[in-house]
């Protein structure tokens, strides 16, 4: 089973917590891939190196069935991890290693239990709705996905027209 580990380069936790996380993942035999920033932060904190084929970049390509993304940080880390999935149907687990964690519900303590449940297929998945935003700009059309919200920022004096659709039906 594959685990996509995601975190930002700035980590609130120390080397020992990172070693514990990696040890638990190895104990359960997960095939782990890490984003570049997380791999660099672990290397800096622990001296551990990862082979190039275990590191992914900005976007995540197709993954085998049973893949789970584990976001290690706070809510902002989880939201960025979801963004990097680009709408791929991969379950996401947030481990709260930051200061606040409304979306990252799993505590940093109890990793054996959490990853044991994943390995045994016992962790329940709660489907979440995604928001898709599309816009027509001077440089061309652009779209993006969001888990819980998006913002529109004004740049200069411009008119804004908004059409809102839910499940393909225009509602506003």
Question: Which residues are covered by each model-predicted region?
Answer:
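Short glycine/serine/threonine-rich phosphate/pyrophosphate-binding segments
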Residues: 14-15, 76-82
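Short glycine-rich anion-binding loops that position phosphate/pyrophosphate groups of nucleotides
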Residues: 10, 74-77, 98-100
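Catalytic core of DAGKc-family lipid kinases
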Residues: 98-172
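Short, solvent-exposed amphipathic alpha-helical segments in soluble enzyme
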Residues: 19-24, 86-87, 167
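Short beta-strand segments
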Residues: 6, 71-73, 94-95
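ATP/NTP phosphate-donor binding region
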Residues: 1-68, 109-124, 135-144
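Phosphate- and divalent-cation-binding pockets in alpha/beta enzyme and binding domains
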Residues: 42, 80-81, 102
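Gly/Ser-rich helix-loop-strand patches that form or flank binding pockets
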Residues: 84-98, 102
């Amino acid at each position: 089973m594959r685990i996509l580990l995601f975190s930002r380069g700035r980590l609130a936790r120390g080397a020992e917590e990172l070693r514990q996380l990696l040890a638990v993942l190895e104990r359960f035999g997960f095939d782990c891939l890490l984003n570049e920033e997380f791999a660099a932060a672990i290397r800096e904190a622990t001296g551990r190196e990862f082979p190039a084929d275990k590191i992914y970049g900005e976007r995540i390509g197709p993954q085998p069935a049973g893949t789970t993304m584990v976001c290690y940080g706070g809510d902002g880390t989880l939201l960025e991890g979801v963004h990097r999935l680009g709408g791929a149907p991969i379950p996401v687990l947030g481990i709260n290693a930051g200061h606040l964690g409304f979306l990252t519900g799993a505590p940093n303590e109890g990793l054996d239990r959490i990853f044991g449940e994943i390995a045994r297929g016992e962790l329940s998945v709660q489907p979440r709705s995604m928001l898709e935003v599309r816009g027509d700009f001077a440089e061309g059309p652009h779209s993006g996905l969001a888990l819980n919200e998006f913002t529109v920022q004004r740049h200069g004096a411009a008119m804004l027209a908004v059409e809102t659709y839910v499940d393909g039906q225009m509602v506003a």
